[in-house]
């Protein structure tokens, strides 16, 4: 057999194999298709069964939900019916109550109508009686109704005028008493709250020396050292027998302070000659200037005043070295500031302005003697120059009456200034005058005939005189009081006014046995 035959046989075998393979594949495919169809039918049947079951379940759930909703609706309907029935019962009860009230009101209205009718009948009867009485009164009195009214009105008018005058007098008296009481309370409260320290200033200062040999060195050869120091400072040096002490005498406290500082530095340094004296005096002047500024700033700090011009602060510091009747002017100004502020607070006024004016009120005393005029006017011009407000300027100028006060603060500062200055002991000369005034008051009273005892009280503002009742009668007491007032006015100098109180007392004593 040749190769071609083998090839043909192989091809035939391959074709047969392919046909057999296709047959087998087709058969398997048909079997799978049949199985798939069966599976599909099975799945469909299961799905239909599941759907039917779910449908039945959903229907059951829907029926249950519907049943629940129906039950809820029925419950709500029952509750609403019950509420409606309850409201109906309440309405019926209210209607019954209203019917009862309406019936009661009708009964009351009927009773009121009857009473009204009775009242009208009584009024008619009263009018008839009144007319009869009026006619009878006119006949008896001989006056018409209008004349009687005019007479009564005139009598009432007179009584009202008298009562009004009495009432006005009582109100005025009470108002004055209340005002005096309130003023005393305000001033007393301010004085009690203000505790300022005062040191009576003098015109001399004592410098202690380590030994008496230092006196000769201070005097110097032919007195040139002491002359140089006196010339540069304007202060007199008194060197006497007082052991280990030199007295500086001068009316200008600033110069006296410069001399004190310079002399103490010279004593410590030990080199005392004209050139060294000049150097120390210059240093002392610079120290005093620094001290002046610090004192001014301290004063503003103590009083709580801010916004002052630097020159005003410097002038305030200079007040430390100014005295008025022995009273330090800076301490006095601080005290016036506190007093004015406290009184302003008690009266319901802003204390800031009052304290500012109180601190600056004596600023005119800080300038040198080259500036002429009252210190109040000078102070107001200085305040105006350094742009203080118009109220501050006016209050400074008015605190001694040189200008008309235009604010309550100005009046308060006047009062505070008088309180600070007039306090016994605040000023040396005032203390002496105070004691002399008390003695003179009692002397004037005791000179009068019939005086038993006399007492000067209220810091010399009142003299209380006890007289002998057998010597003077009431008229004589009045005459004595007038005479004493005239004598006081002619012989004494005093601030404000003095009350003369003459007391005559008669006692009758018997004993029952």
From Swiss-Prot:
Molecular function via GO: RNA binding; RNA endonuclease activity
Gene name of the record: rny
Record's function text: Endoribonuclease that initiates mRNA decay.
Protein's name according to its UniProt entry: Ribonuclease Y
Keyword terms, alphabetized: Cell membrane, Endonuclease, Hydrolase, Membrane, Nuclease, RNA-binding, Transmembrane, Transmembrane helix
NCBIfam families noted in UniProt: HDIG, RNase_Y
SUPFAM superfamilies: Eukaryotic type KH-domain (KH-domain type I), HD-domain/PDEase-like
Cross-referenced Pfam families: HD, KH_1, RNase_Y_N
Membrane topology: Single-pass membrane protein
Transmembrane segments: 6-26
GO cellular component, one term: plasma membrane
């Amino acid at each position: 057999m040749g190769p071609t035959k083998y090839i043909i046989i192989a091809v035939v075998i391959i074709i047969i194999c392919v046909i057999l393979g296709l047959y087998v594949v087709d058969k398997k495919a048909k079997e799978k298709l049949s199985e798939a169809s069966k599976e599909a039918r099975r799945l469909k049947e299961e799905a239909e069964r599941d759907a039917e079951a779910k449908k039945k379940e959903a229907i059951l759930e829907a029926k249950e939900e519907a049943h629940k909703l129906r039950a809820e609706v029925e419950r709500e309907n029952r509750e609403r019916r019950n509420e409606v029935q309850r409201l109906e019962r309440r309405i019926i009860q209210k209607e019954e109550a209203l019917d009862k009230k309406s019936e009661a009101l009708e009964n009351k209205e009927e009773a009121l109508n009857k009473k009204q009718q009775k009242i009208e009948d009584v009024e008619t009867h009263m009018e008839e009686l009144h007319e009869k009485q009026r006619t009878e009164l006119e006949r008896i009195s001989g006056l018409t109704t209008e004349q009687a009214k005019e007479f009564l009105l005139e009598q009432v008018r007179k009584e009202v005028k008298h009562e009004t005058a009495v009432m006005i007098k009582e109100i005025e008296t009470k108002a004055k008493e209340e005002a005096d009481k309130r003023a005393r309370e305000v001033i007393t409260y301010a004085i009690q709250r203000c505790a300022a320290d005062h040191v009576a200033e003098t015109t001399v200062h004592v410098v202690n020396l380590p030994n008496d040999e230092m006196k000769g060195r201070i005097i110097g050869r032919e007195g040139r050292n002491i002359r140089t120091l006196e010339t540069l400072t304007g202060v007199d040096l008194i060197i006497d027998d007082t052991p280990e002490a030199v007295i500086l005498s001068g009316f200008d406290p600033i110069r006296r302070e410069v001399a004190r500082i310079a002399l103490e530095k010279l004593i410590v340094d030990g080199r005392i000659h004209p050139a060294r004296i000049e150097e120390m005096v210059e240093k002392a002047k610079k120290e005093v200037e620094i001290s002046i500024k610090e004192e001014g700033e301290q004063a503003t700090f103590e009083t709580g005043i801010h916004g002052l011009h630097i020159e005003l602060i410097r002038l305030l510091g200079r007040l430390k070295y100014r005295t008025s009747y022995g009273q330090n002017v800076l301490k006095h100004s601080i005290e016036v500031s506190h007093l004015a502020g406290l009184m302003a607070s008690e009266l319901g006024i802003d204390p800031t302005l009052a304290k500012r004016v109180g601190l600056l009120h004596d600023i005119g005393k800080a300038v040198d003697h080259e500036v002429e005029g009252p210190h109040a006017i000078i102070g107001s011009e200085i305040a105006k120059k350094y742009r203080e407000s118009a109220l501050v300027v006016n209050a400074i100028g008015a605190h001694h009456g040189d200008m008309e006060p235009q604010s309550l603060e100005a009046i308060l500062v006047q009062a505070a200034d008088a309180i600070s200055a007039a306090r016994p002991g605040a000023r040396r000369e005032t203390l002496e005058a105070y004691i002399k005034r008390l003695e003179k008051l009692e002397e004037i009273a005791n000179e009068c005939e019939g005086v038993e005892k006399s007492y000067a009280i209220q810091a010399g503002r009142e003299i209380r005189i006890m007289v002998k009742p057998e010597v003077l009668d009431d008229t004589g007491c009045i005459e004595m009081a007038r005479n004493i007032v005239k004598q006081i006015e002619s012989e004494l100098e005093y601030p404000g006014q003095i009350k003369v109180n003459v007391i005559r007392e008669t006692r009758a004593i018997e004993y029952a046995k």
